[in-house]
């Protein structure tokens, strides 16, 4: 079986806090509409980190910082074996413009399972979830439960 070697960016709001991750819905092929971490194939002569920076620039018009390896997925699809290195990343510059995907969302630890993931990406969600922090509530004041008054 042919092996395809790729990289994926687990883009988070902050590599320290990791409260939200960015996922995209595939816009083409047999798995159209299923969700994945953005990335792509490693070209000859590239390191995984170089490939990831290039792919995110091409797919999302965004510059990223590549952090630590989250893990490597080894997954057998019907037509090929996928070997995918997943890295923590964060945005340095750019607006995450969708050039290939049909949709995108920022997902929290609590709603990471709210989208239909590609089978390979599904296998690393527990590792990602365990590294994420919960989103802090917006209401932190002692006055949060008091009714609003007109000025």
Where are these regions (language model features)?
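Conserved N-terminal beta-strand and adjoining loop/helix that marks the start
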Residues: 1-21
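Conserved Nudix-box catalytic region and its N-terminal flanking loop in Nudix hydrolases
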Residues: 18-58
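Short secondary-structure junctions
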Residues: 59-66
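Active-site-adjacent beta-strand/loop module that shapes the phosphate/pyrophosphate-binding cleft
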Residues: 63, 72-95, 103-105, 128
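NUDIX/MutT-family hydrolases
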Residues: 88, 97-128
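Charged phosphate-binding loop/patch that engages nucleotide di/tri-phosphates or the phosphate backbone
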Residues: 120-151
């Amino acid at each position: 079986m042919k092996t395809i070697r790729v990289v994926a960016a687990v883009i988070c709001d902050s590599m320290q806090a990791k409260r939200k991750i960015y996922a995209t819905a595939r816009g083409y092929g047999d798995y159209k509409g299923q969700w994945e971490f953005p990335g792509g194939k490693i070209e000859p002569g590239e390191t995984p980190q170089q490939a990831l920076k290039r792919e995110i620039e091409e797919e999302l018009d965004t510059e990223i910082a590549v952090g630590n390896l989250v893990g490597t997925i080894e997954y057998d699809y019907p037509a090929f074996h996928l070997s995918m290195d997943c890295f923590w990343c964060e945005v340095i510059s750019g607006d995450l413009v969708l050039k290939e995907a049909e949709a995108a969302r920022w997902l929290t630890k609590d709603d990471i399972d709210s989208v239909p993931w590609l089978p390979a990406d599904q296998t690393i969600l527990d590792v990602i979830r365990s590294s994420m922090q919960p989103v802090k509530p917006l209401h932190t004041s002692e006055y949060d439960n008091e009714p609003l008054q007109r000025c």
